[in-house]
From Swiss-Prot:
InterPro entries: Taw3, tRNA_yW-synthesising, tRNA_yW-synthesising-like_sf
Top EC group: transferase
Pfam families: TYW3 (PF02676)
UniProt keyword terms in alphabetical order: Methyltransferase, S-adenosyl-L-methionine, Transferase, tRNA processing
Source organism, top-level taxon: Archaea
Name this polypeptide is given: tRNA(Phe) 7-((3-amino-3-carboxypropyl)-4-demethylwyosine(37)-N(4))-methyltransferase
Amino acid sequence: MGSIEEVLLEERLIGYLDPGAEKVLARINRPSKIVSTSSCTGRITLIEGEAHWLRNGARVAYKTHHPISRSEVERVLRRGFTNLWLKVTGPILHLRVEGWQCAKSLLEAARRNGFKHSGVISIAEDSRLVIEIMSSQSMSVPLVMEGARIVGDDALDMLIEKANTILVESRIGLDTFSREVEELVECF
């Protein structure tokens, strides 16, 4: 296996990495006691279904890892969905970590940078932990319910602006977090 930069480049080229994730993940993977196992840098989705949180009752109609435009949303709205949700989620990372001190410092850095929903999700017998770093920034709002568009043009513009702001601000937090991780001496 090559350097972390080579691995990340290969994963991006085959579609495993979100756009812009390489620099952040290279920083996070620099300390020897931390290895990223999965990542999402945040995204905006338009979800068809009565309840966007149901696995079997919803499907992604549109997804982007970039700020969304009014024309992109309108193009999906014209497809005539019975129920459609606008959802934005911030970044989420899963990191395999060696040792409690490194994990504690990692979680403290995460919380300082807006990742309030972070914690230990598993502990292996060899004392390795899996940490989930999860942004608290999100938004979910219905645009269409029972075939009726419930959001007017002005409100739609405000929602799109808010979704884009959430996405951008959560990425700034991810960048700042990744820079702090590079400095965690207890993780080397």
